[in-house]
Amino acid sequence: MVRFGRNDNKEGIILNIGVYGGTFNPIHFGHLRTAEEVFHKFKLKQVIFVPSAQPPHKSDEEVIDPLHRLKMLTLAITGNEHFTVSDLEIIRPGKSYTVETIRELKKQNPDANFYFILGLDAFLEINTWYHWQELFLETNFIVTTRPGSPQVRPNRIIPQEIRPQFKWKAKNKEFVYSS
């Protein structure tokens, strides 16, 4: 796991919240284990699972109905007090765009510091996302890999267009984005 953070010096932050977005088509043990590991490793207060209603990079016929995925997620996290599910993208009309979701969560929780959790496969395509460069101004990233995946040097996965704006912070073992 690699953390990509913003150069944030907010005073009084009391909540570090993970936002685990995705299709969850369907939710499985790998998602839950990843969320649990990230929760502990990064000392988060909670992890919010946000299933996308209309994923921009997937066709409708390959995705289970959003309400069914929401129900499956809700059942899967039952009993885990630090996991919650948000229906933000399910109730919002149109395509599900991460930047809009993060902005809405920040409005709802102005004292929180958000960490968007995603897999390396998704992060490698982030420069195809809607307003992807703005995401680096809005949230921190935690990029996860699947067990057995080859080691990737973190500086090689940062999109080339914004690579110069990242600096390695050895103390925290993370890349920090400075706008």
Explain the meaning of each model-derived region.
Residues R3-F4, N9-S179:
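Nucleotidyltransferase catalytic core that binds NTPs
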